[in-house]
Design a protein with these regions (language model features):
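Glycine-rich ThDP/TPP pyrophosphate-binding loop and its adjacent helix/strand module
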Residues: 2-144
């Protein structure tokens, strides 16, 4: 998560400053950084620090949260307030009055909605240069 913040900030710096030679490794700062994390790991402090930094710095990022309702063998109710990281993070939600993070939620088994949601997330991050969280729920564990 901390690397995600650094890479997103680099894109913002390239966009806001005319850096000689940056055209060799930047498209005028219009890159977005993609990161991924499991729902159980969102209970760790570094996740909240990274999300807050993304919101404060307004960096172009898409953060994917894969949620299978469990953290190893513990249900969400035992490690996440409100049993939903989207609900926990709702205070970060961007509004017309203040900057923040766009939070999208989609079911992992709904392929068409996944395509639509990710297309929308990419557009928001790239065009408006703000962070987006995509909370993918109702996933199954690989071994059952």
């Amino acid at each position: 998560m901390s690397r995600l913040v650094g890479l997103g900030l680099a894109s913002k710096i390239y966009r806001n400053n005319n850096i000689k030679g940056s055209d060799k490794y930047s498209n005028n700062g219009n890159e977005i950084v993609w990161g991924t994390i499991g729902n159980a790991s969102t209970s760790q402090g570094i996740f909240f620090e990274a999300v807050n930094a993304c919101g404060v710095l307004q960096i172009p990022a898409v953060i994917n949260i894969w949620d299978d309702d469990y953290g190893i063998s513990v249900h969400n109710k035992d490690h996440t307030t409100k049993e939903s990281i989207s609900k926990v993070l709702s205070g970060f939600q961007v509004s017309k009055d203040s900057a923040g993070i766009e939070i999208l939620e989609v079911k992992g088994w709904d392929y068409q909605s996944l395509m639509k949601t990710y297309s929308h997330a990419e557009k928001i991050a790239r065009e408006y240069h703000i962070p987006v969280i995509v909370h993918v729920t109702e996933l199954t564990q690989p071994l059952g």
